[in-house]
């Protein structure tokens, strides 16, 4: 449903850990500054991540439908946030529905966020801050994934040589 689509979109759109998504409060969404506040993430540090315009639209649709109070993604009793276990289970169901055969978890969304930013040319130090990593070494794990993609890219030189060979 819309609730989980919104929650998974927050995880990917902001590079959040599952526990960070489940513990978001409505007040953590700052639509004026287009930021999401992560309160006491891993390492007991607060940080901000970007709030994309498309994510804001999705969150507003979700808010209008669900009318959450307090927690952005409340649990069944609405007093507590959705549990990380429930979030993980819903992710598994969504992956089965999408017929994703690869072994993935909500953390894959965070990994994809970092990898896609890196592949898009975002400085690794910016990615480090967005992910809330204390050490750059932790963030460099994502460069290994990006290197696989780099190998698949055709060099402009090869494209030029092919074009010249075809014109010859």
Where in the sequence are the language-model features?
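Conserved catalytic core of the tyrosine transesterase superfamily
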Residues: 1-168
């Amino acid at each position: 449903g819309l609730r989980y689509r919104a929650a998974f979109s927050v995880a990917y759109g902001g590079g959040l850990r599952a526990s960070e998504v489940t513990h978001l409060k409505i007040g953590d969404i700052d639509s004026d500054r287009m930021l999401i506040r992560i309160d006491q993430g891993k390492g007991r540090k607060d940080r901000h991540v970007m709030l994309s315009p498309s994510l804001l639209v999705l969150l507003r649709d979700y808010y209008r439908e669900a009318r959450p109070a307090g927690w952005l993604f409340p649990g069944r009793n609405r007093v507590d946030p959705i549990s990380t276990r429930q979030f993980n289970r819903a992710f598994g169901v969504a992956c089965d529905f999408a017929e994703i055969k690869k072994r993935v978890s909500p953390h894959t969304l965070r990994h994809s966020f970092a990898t896609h930013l890196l592949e898009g040319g975002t400085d690794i130090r910016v990615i480090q801050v967005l992910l809330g990593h204390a050490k750059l070494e932790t963030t460099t794990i994502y460069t290994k994934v990006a290197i696989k993609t780099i190998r698949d890219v055709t060099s402009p030189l090869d494209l030029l040589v092919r074009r010249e060979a075809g014109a010859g």
